[in-house]
Design a protein with these regions (language model features):
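Short, glycine-/aromatic-enriched active-site segment of Class I SAM-dependent methyltransferases
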Residues: 118-134
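A conserved beta-strand element that flanks and buttresses the S-adenosyl-L-methionine
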Residues: 85
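Class I SAM-dependent methyltransferase SAM/SAH-binding core
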Residues: 21, 26-73
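Short alpha-helix
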Residues: 134-149
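Conserved alpha-helix/loop element of class I SAM-dependent methyltransferases that forms part
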Residues: 2-19
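Core SAM-dependent methyltransferase catalytic element
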Residues: 160-180
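A short glycine-rich, Lys/Arg-flanked "PGG" loop and its adjoining helix->strand segment in the class I
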Residues: 97-112
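Conserved S-adenosyl-L-methionine
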Residues: 151-162
Length: 180
């Protein structure tokens, strides 16, 4: 919804995104926003129906490709992407550490990970309604996961607070793979 859109619009200031991986890409709205700023965008989602909806939505954009599969174990060679976006992908991750390690593997040296995720909450009914598999994360927890996956965390903070119940907060994090 509006949280990832606000974050993505702020990130539009990044020039020349290069080759982009969009994890848990959903129906392709985010990919459509960043495609004009990228050499290529690869959308990954576990749902074939969602991938088909994204393919239909973005059929007129030539630099976007689609992959149905598990974001925790992707078939791409190491160092394939300049940027990995995980806009609420962690909400659907059964193993956040593994997902971040996979993102690190797929980034080129100096590449950047940008993620957004709900801050820790207690709304289990919402979690179930949206097929989330966890109740979010705290900033310190995310920073530790990023470091443990080999990233240098550059930013990790609450960037959005909803003004009505259940008052969800969104954490946005940016991290970089070392240039070595």
């Amino acid at each position: 919804g509006r949280s990832w859109e606000a974050t993505s619009r702020a990130l539009m200031t990044l020039l020349s995104l290069g080759d982009v991986l969009d994890l848990a890409s959903g129906d392709g709205v985010f990919a459509g926003l960043i495609a004009p700023h990228a050499r290529s965008v690869t959308c990954v989602d576990i749902s074939g129906a969602v991938i088909n909806a994204a393919r239909k939505r973005l059929s007129d954009i030539g630099n976007v490709s689609f992959h149905e599969g598990d974001m925790h174990q992707l078939p791409f060679p190491p160092a394939s992407f300049d940027h990995v976006f995980a806009m609420h992908a962690l909400s659907f991750s059964t193993d956040a550490a593994n997902l971040l390690t996979e993102a690190h593997r797929l980034l080129r040296p100096g590449g950047r990970l940008v993620l957004a995720v709900l801050r820790k909450h207690s709304h289990e009914e919402t979690m179930r309604a949206f097929d989330h598999v966890n109740l979010g994360f705290e900033e310190a927890e995310l920073q530790a996961l990023l470091r443990g996956s080999g990233f240098v965390a550059q930013e990790c903070s609450v960037t959005s607070r909803e003004s009505r119940p259940p008052y969800f907060e969104v954490i946005t994090a940016m991290a970089r793979r070392e240039k070595t």
